[in-house]
Curated annotation (Swiss-Prot):
The keyword Transmembrane applies. This is Heme oxygenase 1. Pfam families: Heme_oxygenase. A soluble form arises by proteolytic removal of the membrane anchor. Signal peptide: none annotated. It is a single-pass type IV membrane protein.
Length: 296
C-alpha cells in the first residue's frame, strides 16, 4: 500500500490526453476485435442504417454543442473551445436534409438510448462542466482523425455524389492541417488546470461516453431487427416521399441520374447481409472514436 499512492500520483501527473488513451484502451481493444472493424473496410454498408446513425448523431452533437456554448467562457473548457473548426451540428443538418428532405426534423427518430446520451451531456454541461472535455475529446478528435478515411469509404459504398452531399459530417473545412490541429488541441487540453480527483472523474466520463455510444448502437439495432422480424424493411417516410417525387419527374434528365443512383443503393441493401450491414453502420461511429484516440 505504501507504494501505490506515489505510483498513482505519478500516473496522474501524466498529460490528460495520454491518460485518456490509457483509460480507454480496453474498450478500444474490444472494438478492434469485432467483425465490423474488418468488414467495414470492404464498404459493405447500406443507406438506411447510415441514415439512422446520422440522425442519432445529430441529437448527440446538438446537446454536446449546446453545453459547449454554455461553458465556452468557463476556464474548465474555454481553452479547447474551437467552434469553427470542430462543431458538427450544422454539418449534420446538411446531411439530414440531403437524406430525408426539407422536413427531416419530423422524420428522424430519437431512440431512448440516444435520449439517455443527450440527457447525460446536459447534466455534465450544467452541473459538472469540468467533465465536458471528456466528451468533446473522444468525439471530435475521433471524428477528425478517422473522418477522411470514412468519408471515402461511405462515398464509394453508398455511391454518394463526388461533390460531398451526405458527407458533410466528415468534412472539417475549418481545419487545414489535421495533425497540427490535433497537436494544438492536445496541448490546450493538457494545460487545463485539474487536480488528481478531477482527472480521475474525466477518465471515468470518457469511458462512460463509450458505453453510451454502445447503448445507442444497440437501440438502433433493435429498431432495425424489429422491422426485419415483421417481414419487411424499415421504410422511412422520406424514402417514400422521394419515390413519389421521382415518379412524377421520371422523364427529366436529372431524374434519370437520381433513379440510377437510387437503384444502385437499393441493390446494395438487398445483396448485403442485414447483420453485417448493421455492424458496419455502427462501425462508422465506433471507428471514428477508436481511430481518433489511438492514431495520435
Amino acid at each position: 500500500m505504501e507504494t501505490s499512492q506515489p505510483h498513482n500520483a505519478e500516473s496522474m501527473s501524466q498529460d490528460l490526453s495520454e491518460l485518456l488513451k490509457e483509460a480507454t484502451k480496453e474498450v478500444h481493444e474490444q472494438a478492434e476485435n469485432t467483425p465490423f472493424m474488418k468488414n467495414f473496410q470492404k464498404g459493405q454498408v447500406s443507406l438506411h442504417e447510415f441514415k439512422l446513425v446520422t440522425a442519432s448523431l445529430y441529437f448527440i452533437y446538438s446537446a454536446l454543442e449546446e453545453e459547449i456554448e454554455r461553458n465556452k467562457d468557463n476556464p474548465v473548457y474555454a481553452p479547447v473551445y474551437f467552434p469553427m473548426e470542430l462543431h458538427r451540428k450544422a454539418a449534420l443538418e446538411k446531411d439530414l436534409e440531403y437524406f430525408y428532405g426539407s422536413n427531416w426534423r419530423a422524420e428522424i427518430p430519437c431512440p431512448e438510448a440516444t435520449q439517455k446520451y443527450v440527457e447525460r451531456l446536459h447534466v455534465v454541461g450544467k452541473k459538472h462542466p469540468e467533465l465536458l472535455v471528456a466528451h468533446a475529446y473522444t468525439r471530435y478528435l475521433g471524428d477528425l482523425s478517422g473522418g477522411q478515411v470514412l468519408k471515402k469509404i461511405a462515398q464509394k459504398a453508398l455511391q454518394l455524389p463526388s461533390t460531398g452531399e451526405g458527407l458533410a459530417f466528415f468534412t472539417f473545412d475549418g481545419v487545414s492541417n489535421a495533425t497540427k490541429f490535433k497537436q494544438l488541441y492536445r496541448s490546450r487540453m493538457n494545460a487545463l488546470e485539474m487536480d488528481h480527483a478531477t482527472k480521475k472523474r474525466v477518465l471515468e466520463e470518457a469511458k462512460k461516453a463509450f458505453l453510451l455510444n454502445i447503448q445507442v448502437f444497440e437501440a438502433l439495432q433493435k429498431l432495425v431487427s424489429k422491422s426485419q422480424e415483421n417481414g419487411h424493411a424499415v421504410q422511412p417516410k422520406a424514402e417514400l416521399r422521394t419515390r413519389s417525387v421521382n415518379k412524377s419527374h421520371e422523364n427529366s434528365p436529372a431524374a434519370g441520374k437520381e433513379s440510377e443512383r437510387t437503384s444502385r443503393m437499393q441493390a446494395d441493401m438487398l445483396t448485403t447481409s442485414p447483420l453485417v450491414r448493421w455492424l458496419l453502420a455502427l462501425g462508422f461511429i465506433a471507428t471514428t472514436v477508436a481511430v481518433g484516440l489511438f492514431a495520435m
